[in-house]
A protein has these predicted regions:
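Peripheral, non-catalytic segments that deliver or gate enzyme domains
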Residues: 1-181
Length: 181
C-alpha cells in the first residue's frame, strides 16, 4: 500500500492547517500540518518501516503511542478538537485530541475489549457510539464528547445465544522464539 491511505482534512476553524494520517512512526497517527506557503521548505526523513518520506511545512504529531487511529469522525469546532476512533489490540474506543495542546481526552486504559464505530453530530458535541463485546452483541449509546460519558442508552441487544451453552472466550499472548515478541 502507498500513503496516503486517508484523505487529508482541513481544520474548519483554520483553513491554513490540515490533518494528515500516517504510519511514519510505525502506527497510524494524526499529524497537524501548516499549509502556509511560506513554510513549505521540505526535507526527507526515515520512517519506522524502513522507507523514507518527504515533509514540507511545519508539522506536529498530535497522537502517539502503541495504538493506531482507525477513523477520524470529525471535529468539535468550539473546543478545537478532533474526534477519532483508535484501536490497541482487542480494545477500541473514541477519543478527542485538542489541536492546540495535543491533550487526549481519556487514557486508553479506560477502554474495554470491544469493537467501536461512531457517528459524530454536526457540532461535534455528541456521538452515536455503536459497539459490541465478546459477551454483548450490540450496544448503541449517545455519548457526550466533552467527557466521553454515556448520556443515553439507545439499544442494548439481547444475546441470540441466551439459553444455549456457549464456550467461554479467552484471549492471551504467546511469546515468539526470541522471547520478547
Amino acid at each position: 500500500y502507498v500513503e496516503p491511505q486517508n484523505a487529508i482534512a482541513f481544520l474548519p476553524w483554520d483553513p491554513t492547517k490540515f490533518i494528515y494520517q500516517s504510519q511514519r512512526d510505525g502506527y497510524n497517527h494524526l499529524y497537524l500540518f501548516d499549509a502556509d506557503a511560506t513554510n513549505m521548505k521540505g526535507e526527507t526523513y526515515n520512517s519506522a518501516n524502513g522507507g523514507t518520506y518527504f515533509q514540507a511545512g511545519k508539522v506536529k504529531q498530535l497522537t502517539k503511542g502503541n495504538w493506531l487511529v482507525s477513523d477520524v469522525l470529525g471535529f468539535n469546532t468550539k473546543r478545537k478538537e478532533i474526534i477519532f476512533t483508535a484501536v490497541e489490540g482487542l480494545r477500541s474506543g473514541h477519543f478527542a485530541v485538542n489541536v492546540s495542546n495535543g491533550k487526549i481526552s481519556q487514557p486508553f486504559e479506560n477502554c474495554k475489549e470491544s469493537e467501536h464505530s461512531g457517528m459524530l453530530s454536526a457540532s461535534g458535541t455528541y456521538l452515536i457510539d455503536r459497539y459490541s463485546t465478546k459477551d454483548q452483541p450490540r450496544i448503541i449509546n449517545l455519548v457526550d464528547t466533552k467527557n466521553f460519558k454515556e448520556t443515553a442508552n439507545l439499544l442494548t441487544a439481547e444475546s441470540p445465544y441466551e439459553g444455549y451453552q456457549m464456550p467461554s472466550i479467552e484471549t492471551g499472548t504467546i511469546k515468539a522464539a526470541d522471547g520478547t515478541t
